[in-house]
Amino acid sequence: MSDRSDPTHAIWQKVLAALTADDRITPQLHGFISLVEPKGVMTGTLYLEVPNDLTRGMLEQRIRVPLLNAIGSLDEAAGVSNFAIVVNPGIAQDAFAQHPEPAEQPYIETPTITAPTDNPGLPASPSRGDSRLNPKYGFDTFVIGGSNRFAHAAAVAVAEAPAKAYNPLFIYGDSGLGKTHLLHAIGHYAISLYPGIRVRYVSSEEFTNDFINSIANNRSSLFQSRYRDNDILLIDDIQFLQGKDSTQEAFFHTFNTLHDHNKQVVITSDLPPKHLTGFEDRMRSRFEWGLITDVQAPDLETRIAILRKKAQSEKLQVPDDILEYMATKVTSNIRELEGTLIRVTAFASLNKTPVDLALVQTVLKDLITLDEDNVIAPVDIINHTAAYFKLTVDDLYGSSRSQAVATARQIAMYLCRELTNLSLPKIGQLFGNRDHTTVMYANKKITELMKERRSIYNQVTELTSRIKQNHRYGKM
């Protein structure tokens, strides 16, 4: 932090005053400016430090002209005619450390919740172990490309300086493009930078279920502390709250409490705020307070890099020309791309053959011919799976834990994940309102079994072929 008695500080305050009065500086841009530390003046240049490349880029591009105008309005005695930017990641940590947590204040009670009597046994705040972060999703495993570069930079900046630049950070894009990965990566990176920081990841479905349970069990205090006693709240698939007025009200108060206490909120959605239906205007406006960025389908180079990274992480030996071939054939999303790699290598492992072009073409012949504009309905997947295993649809929706039914259900969940753009919570809803973690487990288990058991691999492959052929030709 700069010394307030330093002449440089006085110069910077005058620059800030001019920028504050400039209509071109939006609240979002003010967030970037708030991260700047003036360091000194040398030969007419005002040197400024920022915590990351994203902030430097914004200052040198979108804010450059207003900043030069503000410098031009200074007295000649200031001796400043230009500025230079230096990136110093250390000031992000300093800034966060210099803002201690505010004193505890009573929360405003959500109108739809009746507050229970205080229970001294309730935890005061979530522990680090309760963050619910996936250890596989870090910035080190995220592949950066033109389709996600800005979203990645924004996510890194938020982790380095929570609630300092853009709050909330709102990331939108189609399913399977890396939004959830970025949420978890923010949490992991922030924890590595600030030991003891309180981070919680939650899907909107989980938030809704917790809210409903808190009403049913008269545990509103626990619900509030779980989501409000955090330094960073990461909420996935906010569109799931569409039309859920009471849950939106609970989230509205949670958001306000965190924002008012300078705590970071990061939100993902399949649509930008202005296109979200079923939300009150006041909620959508809060989504737009900070930075809005999107992730798009990866280009060819990025798809190749994603496959290469996945092969390395799974210790799979796949020639580069094979990775390039797969990348040219699977273009829709990252999830399908990685699933294709797993299926190819599983086939090679089961047959004890090398991964070559002929093998890839054989495995993918029924997977890569479907027009990506044609969307497979999850009900078709469920119907085909039930018929294939000689079960009823109710068996797959039901609670039976017999091995035959459970395996069929897990395969159906896996195929819904692979062949549709549905989120984990929505797939869970299809299967008797199961939790999204059940879908995650099913996806992981079937992926592993395909590598180990030829019967499972053959079943998944044959089912996939039948589903796609039926979709293509319109017959069961």
Swiss-Prot record:
Leader sequence segment: none
Keywords: ATP-binding, Cytoplasm, DNA replication, DNA-binding, Lipid-binding, Nucleotide-binding
PROSITE patterns, per database record: DNAA (PS01008)
Residues that coordinate or bind ATP: G176, G178, K179, T180
Entry-linked Pfam families: Bac_DnaA, Bac_DnaA_C
Domain II, as annotated region: 87-131
Family the entry assigns: Belongs to the DnaA family.
Database matches in PANTHER family: CHROMOSOMAL REPLICATION INITIATOR PROTEIN DNAA (PTHR30050:SF2)
Protein name as it appears in the record: Chromosomal replication initiator protein DnaA
Gene name for this UniProt entry: dnaA
